[in-house]
Design a protein with these regions (language model features):
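Sequence-structural signature of the catalytic-core scaffold of metal-dependent phosphohydrolases
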Residues: 1-51, 59-192
Length: 192
């Protein structure tokens, strides 16, 4: 929320709780993909997806979005450095999964991982990150603009060859999500 919490006083929560929320949405989606779309989803990608969801904002500092342009920093690059640096505990834990696991997680965050399904679940126009922060920010600010039907979106999301897609019968839920995102930016994030 950055400085929006000064206008919306209830709008205070942590990156930690947000990352847990992104992880949970990613977990639900990968579970759905494993159950409903085993031919289109490689279940070995589920752990990577959930790990990237949990760690995606690791490089954020206080007011990070506000100060990134000022100090010419990039939280995603910092996140990748933390994940790939042999000196960090996170790197050491990820190595226990597989020797190349830290590099894979970092490549998801860098959007260079070859499986675009995984990348798009973490970072795209409709992803676990945005779904969580819209609902979370709407709840904590008391602004209802960010509300959308997550349950319906989870019912209609599906893996396709080059990413993720949504079934036509869920288009109203997708339209509602897009409008909710627009309204949150206009009414909360860019509040006059």
């Amino acid at each position: 929320l950055g400085t929006s919490s000064y206008t919306f006083h209830g709008g205070e929560h942590s990156r930690f709780s947000h990352c847990l929320g992104v992880y949970e949405i990613a977990r639900q989606i990968t579970e759905i993909f494993e159950e409903k779309y085993p031919d289109e989803w490689d279940s070995s990608e589920s752990l990577l997806t959930m790990t990237a969801a949990l760690l995606h904002d690791l490089g954020h500092g206080a007011y990070s979005h506000t100060f990134e342009n000022l100090f010419d920093t990039n939280h995603e690059a910092i996140t990748q450095d933390i994940i790939q640096s042999p000196d960090t505990e996170i790197h050491q834990v990820l190595l226990q999964v597989a020797p190349d696991f830290p590099k894979k997680v970092a490549s998801v965050i860098d959007h260079t991982y070859p499986n675009k399904q995984v990348v798009q679940l973490i970072s795209s126009q409709i992803d676990a990150d945005r779904m969580d922060y819209l609902l979370r920010d709407s709840y904590f600010t008391g602004a209802f603009y960010g509300q959308f039907d997550l349950t319906r979106i989870l019912r209609v999301i599906r893996p396709v060859k080059n990413g993720i897609a949504f079934q036509r019968n869920g288009m109203h839920a997708i339209e509602d999500y897009v409008l909710s995102r627009y309204q949150m930016y206009m009414q909360v994030y860019f509040h006059p």
